Amino acid sequence: MKGKFLKVSSLFVATLTTATLVSSPAANALSSKAMDNHPQQSQSSKQQTPKIQKGGNLKPLEQREHANVILPNNDRHQITDTTNGHYAPVTYIQVEAPTGTFIASGVVVGKDTLLTNKHVVDATHGDPHALKAFPSAINQDNYPNGGFTAEQITKYSGEGDLAIVKFSPNEQNKHIGEVVKPATMSNNAETQVNQNITVTGYPGDKPVATMWESKGKITYLKGEAMQYDLSTTGGNSGSPVFNEKNEVIGIHWGGVPNEFNGAVFINENVRNFLKQNIEDIHFANDDQPNNPDNPDNPNNPDNPNNPDNPNNPNNPDNPDNGDNNNSDNPDAA
């Protein structure tokens, strides 16, 4: 696969694909096909203020053979009030790799966790400390919520280009999900084709560390695959895809020129993976009384009022149950 060359100014940068790292003046190969879902743990959890790389040595990360997918619908506009509402957890990422410093995007979804792409974390070459995150970044001179250094990486066990990154607290002992409110995830029960969406992140064709939002519609949806008609470029890798309720419905990975951009859709399989690995991740319906995952739902097996819960005093399998039919009860006949 031949690399595409991109002109670089002091503020704009080159690109990384699944098979090709594109920079000026030469292209270097980098593969991100590994599907290892075992966590990569750093040797130390000590947090220091991350060094911020500026200027033209930055290279946006992108997926598949292309990521600079500017479609006829090129409704991109800059977000300057980055600390407000659902924009606050959108995060600027730098990866300090042996071959250079790369930029990407992500979204905070837990007290100490962020979602991005597998091909973004692959650029760390197994060293989580190489990945730095700057939530709500305004520009390369203004990081209102500071920076955080990764300590553990967990890749999605399925085919989707998705990864979880866990961070150490900062020097003030604050976690990344404490300086910003984590994003709310959609249960995606009502997500369908033709719905309005936005992709928000840090594209590499714009001034460094500036947040941009693209607007469009879903054009395809099946399994973990979601496609849409809005425009993105390298650096948008890992950007959250929001629905009209400002809930995260997917994580952007890249696209195909003149055709579509795409994301990992948060379907049931992805949702289960996230819940298994992020204890405090919040989905929009978690608090609903009929949600089986809600601990207050009497049908939740962990609810002590559930008659099937062995800790329920009325459960005949509970040794504290006074039912004489329970042979484990010392008061049983």
UniProtKB/Swiss-Prot annotation:
For this UniProt record, the keywords arranged alphabetically read as follows:
Hydrolase, Protease, Repeat, Secreted, Serine protease, Signal, Virulence, Zymogen
Where are the catalytic residues? 119 (charge relay system), 161 (charge relay system), 237 (charge relay system)
Q: Could you say which enzyme class this protein belongs to?
A: hydrolase
Q: What is its EC number?
A: 3.4.21.19
Positions of region (Disordered): 33-61, 283-333
Subcellular localization: Secreted
Show the ranges annotated as biased composition (Low complexity).
Answer: 40-54, 286-333
Q: RNA-binding: is it a keyword of this entry?
A: no
For the biological process aspect of GO, one term held by this record is: proteolysis
Signal peptide (from-to): 1-29
Q: Please give the Gene Ontology molecular function terms for this protein.
A: serine-type endopeptidase activity
Q: Which InterPro entries match?
A: Glutamyl_endopeptidase, Peptidase_S1_PA, Peptidase_S1_PA_chymotrypsin, Peptidase_S1B, Peptidase_S1B_tx, V8_his_AS, V8_ser_AS
Modified after translation how? Proteolytically cleaved by aureolysin (aur). This cleavage leads to the activation of SspA.
Positions of the record's site feature: Cleavage: 68-69
Major localisation: secreted
Query: Pfam families in the record, alphabetically?
Result: Trypsin_2 (PF13365)
Reaction it catalyzes: Preferential cleavage: Glu-|-Xaa, Asp-|-Xaa
Q: Which residues form the propeptide?
A: 30-68
What is one term from the GO cellular component aspect held by the record? extracellular region
Tell me which family the UniProt entry assigns to this protein. Answer: Belongs to the peptidase S1B family.
What else the UniProt entry mentions is:
The cascade of activation of extracellular proteases proceeds from the metalloprotease aureolysin (aur), through SspA to SspB.
What's the protein name?
A: Glutamyl endopeptidase
Species for this entry: Staphylococcus aureus (strain MSSA476)
